[in-house]
Amino acid sequence: MSAFTRRTLLTASAGAAALALSSCGLAGGKDEGPTEKDGVTTIVVGASPKPHAEILQFVQDELAQEAGLSLKITQYTDYQIPNQALNDGDLDANFYQTPNFLEQQEKEKGYEFHGFEGIHVEPMGLYSDSLASLDEVPDGAKAAIANDPANTGRGLALFEAAGLITLKEGVDVISATPADIAENPKNIEFTTLEAAQIARSLGDVDLGAVNGNYALEAGKSPKDDSLFLEPGEDSPYGNMLVVREADKDNEALVKLNELLHSDEVKAFIEETYSDGSVIPAF
């Protein structure tokens, strides 16, 4: 297996920042996969800070060495850059996305990726800085949903599940937009924002659909602070490890995925996120 010669951290744009958890430079080079040296394979993984990077750090601290792996974890607060970095060869894998988001990205960007089985679910919730319950939603309320297509549809499905809107019959949730709303008795005005910005923008709207990881980063408890929480059981939104299609059988990456589905990781998730904000998907 060829050794990588360098790694380049992407400079995040539009306020998105990438922060390396390791003080060492990233090992490796473009498109060649994990690097092996002295019997240890280094894998560079991009992840959202919470809970993805925390779960990966647990694997690095407790499980990786015995498995002959070393993880270099790079944090991203943006939903677009980690897939770009994986496609460009700056990452060997990323861990932050759901199947519907991956499907949408592959359609839009032409990526050829492989998603392993779901590891955990972060229930999306409706949050507000001004309302104590959904009963208080005013006529003409301003609401924020994510502007990436997969999470736009997921957010609208959440508003529908909460009884605030009804989507047109037969609409594909993965591509749903506000134009697909059939009934809107509260005349809610929807605006779209970067997913990472919604939790920080709740003061500007009446309520917003916030992804679980961004709720955690904003110091909110999905179980205690949300007005309505997406059901976690049998969720199609399991977060998964994603690699390039050509690397799906790479021994080190397959091994990492196995570690992420281990009993130890399941126990870590259940104990660390006991408020139900992160739920094992296996």
What are these model-predicted stretches?
Residues P49-K72, I81:
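Short, polar/charged alpha-helical segment
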Residues C24-T35:
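Bacterial lipoprotein signal-peptidase II cleavage site
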Residues R6-L10:
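N-terminal export leaders
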Residues F116-I165, K266-A267:
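A conserved helix-loop-strand patch within extracytoplasmic ligand-binding domains
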Residues P123-L134, Y237-N250:
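A bilobed periplasmic-binding-protein/Venus flytrap-type ligand-binding module shared by bacterial periplasmic
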Residues D38-K50, L69-Q75, K142-A143:
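Short, well-ordered beta-strand elements
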Residues G153-E160, L260-P280:
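Periplasmic-binding protein-like
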Residues I73-Q84, D172-R200:
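Short helix-initiation/N-cap motifs at beta->coil->alpha
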